[in-house]
Regions:
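Catalytic-core helical/loop segments in enzymes performing group transfer/polymerization on anionic/lipid-linked
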Residues: 1-628
Length: 628
């Protein structure tokens, strides 16, 4: 669990252990924050004495931005697990005459420096009795701590108050603590939430935050000689003694950067919080591990079914791309999932893990018969200046790094066009692809498109680039283009061709979007998502368009707002900036042979086997099935 921590902690320390930020189990991903403290001994007393000494030395020299950092810590609900909704549970937000008293439950065996299980059970019983005695008319809430531990919950060995209510674990505890009047805990990390929200914290154990004069302590707190402020304590524990992983570079970073990352996780969960129960229909086994983190964006449960008739009440149906929804009962909500526009360093059909995917509640973005979530974003969102600036910077970096959807490698063209000739690139597409079936009218094949382009540009130097999925043999769509094009390029990479082209003519290929990002003239003959906004020359009228867009607005909608990005190392959601950083180096490799490569089928077999194994492990770990 601490491999990254130990690799990054270069100082000579005696103890390294996980901090309390964004807790998760070992199988869920690497630790993101850890303590690195020179302890005289690996004991609770030594830990407290280190804090005390640091407070005595630095209490008058707290960094000026600690208060702002603490506020961000609370807003991000930094001590809650990744998929918690960062809002107060509805019942606590309602006006009532009764006091709300929160009791935090913990595991019998707690963290590194907690007392033994017997002592902790006794402390919990004492805590329960004290809370009932002090607040006989209160409404009690029991919430389970997210801190790692083993054994039964302490509440299992204790008689609970009559009418006690159980906290809904879908919500972040940090967002609800400000709405209670008292918090009772033995030693849960979430007790810090009470202190940071000015809620009285009643402590019956010896956590690091107790004993400094800011908590109501019901037992001896040895080793505390200082009386520091909450800001000073926070600074010592989470800034001075803690180390944090930078989620973009995967190197040592700052708490501020980690809080940005946690805020992103909260935003994703909030965006997809309605997807609490998802049934994915007819997904191939090799795709399941790749789709899992995206379909789990709402933090609920996910199961795989073979037919739409197997859906249960309250479930969302999930379909891949434009797959047929036949058999789905009326009224069942549905989402569609598809590869994002910054996908990977290999073909999706070669079973390469996707760095981004899109989840659309309305319909596939490549189906012009109906609006999609992307269409709605591009029509209706008032992109603020900072977001447009971010989009411009992202676009510039994508262009600088030569990135596209699949990033198979780079190879410049070897042909040379005659001087003063307009170079027109015609990217091929997969003949049976949904974007062709749904997104074309009249001209529906690459051959017909080449005929049309030659008619429109009789004197141009036309370059035809077959689709890599077709060259690989994974999909159909080979055409005899030699009689219509001046060059049929099967060796160069797409971005190198776009860079030398003057114009790009396409049915609905994503290459048109790549060309727009690079300032090229783009002519469309189908109905792609990027057409119809005033940025392209379109042969067809584009439906569902309400306004014109700038290139930065299109980029903001298509690359910032619409997709989900996933870090397969950290196993958390990430940003497009982080994804392009990881794609950059492998994307620079020399483009290998795609067509006729004899070892490609072997690699596909290995990947299929690996993905099927991962999916089987995931099923076992999560005990697949509805949890209601």
């Amino acid at each position: 669990m601490l491999q990254i921590a130990r690799r990054l902690s270069r100082t000579n320390v005696d103890a390294v252990w996980p901090s309390f930020i964004l807790p998760r189990k070992r199988r869920e991903g690497p630790v993101l924050s850890w303590f690195s403290v020179p302890l005289a001994a690996l004991t609770a007393r030594a830990w407290i004495e280190s804090i005390d000494a640091a407070l005595a030395a630095s209490s008058s020299d707290v960094l000026p931005d600690v208060s702002a950092l603490m506020q961000r810590f609370v807003v991000a609900c930094a001590l809650d697990p990744v998929h918690r909704i960062p809002r107060c549970i509805p019942e606590l937000g309602r006006a009532t005459d009764k006091q709300h008293v929160l009791l935090i439950d913990e595991r019998a065996s707690g963290g590194r420096f907690d007392a033994d299980p017997k002592a902790r059970r006794a402390s919990f019983q004492q805590m329960m009795a004290a809370a009932v005695s002090a607040h006989p008319d209160a409404e009690f809430w029991l919430a389970r701590s997210s801190a790692p531990g083993r054994g039964p919950w302490l509440s299992c060995a204790c008689e609970l108050p009559a009418g006690i209510r159980h906290f809904d674990s879908a919500y972040a505890l940090g967002a609800s603590v400000p709405h209670v009047q008292h918090v009772y805990t033995v030693a849960a990390p979430e007790g810090l939430y009470a202190m940071m929200s000015d809620t009285p914290a009643h402590v019956f154990g010896t956590p690091y935050y107790a004993g400094w004069g800011m908590t109501d302590d019901h037992c001896s707190q040895p080793g505390r000689r200082s009386r520091a402020s909450l800001a000073a304590l926070f600074h010592v524990v989470f800034v001075r003694f803690a180390r944090h992983l930078d989620p973009v570079t995967h190197e040592l970073g700052t708490l501020d950067a980690l809080l940005d990352f946690i805020a992103l996780q909260r935003a994703v969960t909030t965006r997809y919080e309605d997807l609490r129960h998802v049934a994915a229909i007819r997904f191939q086994w090799w795709k399941r591990p790749f789709a899992t983190p995206y379909l789990n964006a709402g933090g609920g449960d996910l199961r795989w079914v073979g037919n739409a008739s197997e859906l249960l009440a309250g479930e969302h149906a999930a379909l891949w791309g434009a797959r047929n929804a036949e058999g789905l009962r009326d009224g069942i909500p549905m989402v569609r999932i598809e590869d994002g526009f910054l996908h990977s360093t290999g073909l999706g059909s070669d079973m390469i893990a996707p760095q981004s995917q899109v989840i659309d509640r309305r319909g596939p973005y490549f189906d012009p018969a109906r609006p999609s979530d992307l269409t709605a974003l591009l029509n209706d969102v008032d992109f603020p200046p900072f977001e447009l600036a971010r989009a411009a910077a992202l676009r510039a970096e994508i262009v600088r790094l030569g990135l596209t959807k699949y990033n198979l490698g780079r190879r410049a063209p070897t042909w040379r066009a005659p001087a003063n000739k307009c170079i027109v690139l015609v990217p091929g597409q997969v003949a049976d692809d949904a974007s062709i079936r749904l997104g074309t009218r009249g001209i529906t094949t690459s051959e017909a498109l080449l005929h049309e382009v030659r008619t429109r540009r009789p004197d141009a130097f036309i370059v035809y680039k077959p689709h890599p999925d077709v060259l690989s043999g994974n999909r159909v769509g080979l055409v005899n283009a030699a009689r219509l094009a001046d060059a049929v390029d099967v060796d160069s990479d797409l971005i190198s061709l776009i860079e030398v082209a003057d114009e790009v003519h396409t049915l609905s290929s994503l290459a048109g979007f790549d060309a727009l990002l690079r300032g090229k003239s783009v002519f469309t003959y189908g109905l792609p998502f990027y057409a119809g906004w005033g940025l392209t020359h379109d042969a067809l009228e584009q439906p569902w368009r309400k306004r014109t867009l700038s290139l930065d607005m299109l980029t903001a909608g298509a690359l910032l707002r619409y997709p989900l990005y996933w870090d397969w190392t950290l196993r958390l959601y990430t940003t497009p900036e982080a994804v392009i950083r990881r794609l950059a180096e492998p994307a620079r490799r020399s483009l290998g042979k795609i067509r006729g490569n004899p070892i490609r089928p072997m690699f596909k077999i290995v990947r299929w086997t690996r993905n099927a194994f991962r999916h089987a492990v995931w099923q076992i770990e999560t005990k697949q099935g509805p949890k209601r």
